[in-house]
Curated annotation (Swiss-Prot):
Zn(2+) binds at residues 132, 135, 152, 155. Its EC number is 2.7.4.3. It comes from Mycoplasma pneumoniae (strain ATCC 29342 / M129 / Subtype 1) (Mycoplasmoides pneumoniae). This is Adenylate kinase. CDD domains: ADK (cd01428). Catalyzes the reversible transfer of the terminal phosphate group between ATP and AMP. Plays an important role in cellular energy homeostasis and in adenine nucleotide metabolism. Keywords: ATP-binding, Cytoplasm, Kinase, Metal-binding, Nucleotide biosynthesis, Nucleotide-binding, Transferase, Zinc.
């Protein structure tokens, strides 16, 4: 499959990776491909793949690499018209197995790793996070509060904090992320396609840095 402008955004939970990816997609016209959006789209289809995926998702189970790979590639091959100008991957690949599958199908042009030097800053961000259970919009009590307290700006549903957003759980998730992403970072570094972006920079500055490398 011939496709230009293939980019990946990496970052720990709560670092702002999704926000940056969406902003860059909006300014460049590239398609924003998040794992969650792909899963939700495929689950709405009729067929064995959607049923198998729903079995894991509806029970909150970990989706195996093989199924994740199959779901990702199914989405890509059935949305070629939307993706022909290029896309931004957000949340995939997460493991070496997923990376090996991806690179057997296509080659990434650039990888951006959004990184926070101080993990306590990230902990504070996540502890202040509010999520809309209806449309998935994400807010922050300090840096991105909703217009009306505890109400989603888009669909007006009541915002919620995640039950597992505690400092101990967050630090555990960060450690797990670092262990999981380390071999990916090493692989992308060897390939010469990794760019590290400091997550404490203002969003506009992050976008400008990315746009210098995204054509």
């Amino acid at each position: 499959m011939v496709m230009e402008n293939k980019f990946l955004f990496l970052g720990a939970p709560g670092v702002g990776k999704g926000t940056l990816a969406k902003q860059v997609a909006n300014t460049t016209g590239l398609f924003h491909l998040s794992t969650g959006d792909i899963f939700r789209s495929v689950m709405q289809e009729q067929g064995a793949l959607s049923q198998t995926l729903a079995h894991y998702m509806n029970q909150g189970l970990y989706v195996p690499d093989e199924l994740t790979n199959q779901t990702f590639w199914h989405f890509v091959t059935t949305h070629q018209n939307e993706l022909h100008k290029g896309f931004i991957l957000d949340g995939y690949p997460r493991t070496l197995n997923q990376l090996e599958f991806l690179q057997s199908k296509l080659q990434l042009d650039q990888v951006f790793h959004l990184k926070l030097s101080d993990p306590q800053v990230l902990v504070a961000r996540i502890l202040n996070r509010l999520v809309c259970p209806s449309c998935g919009s994400v807010y922050n009590k300090q840096s991105k509060p909703p217009l009306k307290a505890n109400q989603c700006d888009r669909c007006h549903a009541t915002l919620q904090a995640r039950n597992d957003d505690t400092e101990a759980v967050i630090l555990k998730r960060l450690t797990l992320y670092e262990d999981t992403v380390k071999p990916l970072i090493e692989a992308f570094t060897k390939q010469g396609i990794l760019t590290v972006i400091e997550a404490q920079l203002p969003l506009e500055q992050q976008v400008n840095l990315v746009q210098q490398l995204v054509h």
